[in-house]
Amino acid sequence: MTFLELVRKRCSVRQYSDRTVEPEKMNYVLEAARLAPSAVNKQPWHMLLVESEEKRQLLQSCYNREWFKQAPLYLIVCGDHTESWKRADGKDHLDIDVAILTEHLCLAAAEQGLGTCWVCNFDAPRVKELFALPEHIEPIVLLPLGYPADESVFEGEKKRKTLTEIYAHH
């Protein structure tokens, strides 16, 4: 699969099967994330894998959507404010770095036939409390992960702006 084929395959999956994600596939996805670049190579991130039914229910209470409850696994992708690089004007690159890591997770998952969906509209203070995250660690993305209920979801055409709408040459 070429890179463009992979990028075309990756999509937001909101229906999951109950099929178990093999540990070797999960390790592959995590290794792809580990290799993600970051500003000044600070790597200001932490990931929590949520797998037990008890912890899954706790996390589901932070984003109460029926489709979200179907996923067999979740990653809580967090940023570490003490580790992130700040530009001279004060711009913190934490969200950018975590976004790069998260998309590495999503692309590696898609390559392995797994579905994901970025979730940022969740109760972050509740996640922080329920998972006992230290003050300097911010939960930024919830990433449900599992096999799609319908594998044809990977074949759909993406609705995207044309290149001329987003690109200029000077």
Give the predicted meaning of each segment.
Residues 79, 121-122, 147:
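Short secondary-structure boundary segments
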Residues 114-126:
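GST superfamily/GST-like fold recognition
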